[in-house]
């Protein structure tokens, strides 16, 4: 294109392609259903964000696909510690039984019940983390809190 002349459509297309590849950035695209896009876009507009900026904020904020809050992480660590302790207790009961084959059924029953309760707690916590609808609500809250 010479100086002073109008740009042609091919000149504009070339300039757009060159401008779109900024060093240090990667373009990420996603396909959303119409309802998903409308909901996402509406929420972004309510916060004064473009779709692109809302996605950027969300990606920076989540830092992972299953980001969990500190309280949930502590609960999970406590449950895992409890399961480890219960496992040790059961191993001790089995060892005691090997030395003296008279079984303390009440102790074994108590450990088995506690073990089941810990697994139920872990199952409930994992279900809440993996719940898609809850994660969507949490994602909206996280986006608002990030601003």
Swiss-Prot record:
Single Gene Ontology MF annotation: endonuclease activity
Disulfide bonds listed in the record: none
Signal sequence segment: none
EC number: 3.1.-.-
InterPro entries hit by this protein: VirD1
Entry keywords, A to Z: Crown gall tumor, Endonuclease, Hydrolase, Nuclease, Plasmid
Domain of life: Bacteria
Known role: Tumor formation by A.tumefaciens involves the transfer and integration of a defined segment (T-DNA) of Ti plasmid DNA into the plant nuclear genome. The virD operon encodes a site-specific endonuclease that cleaves at a unique site within both 24 bp direct repeats flanking the T-DNA.
Name assigned to this protein: T-DNA border endonuclease VirD1
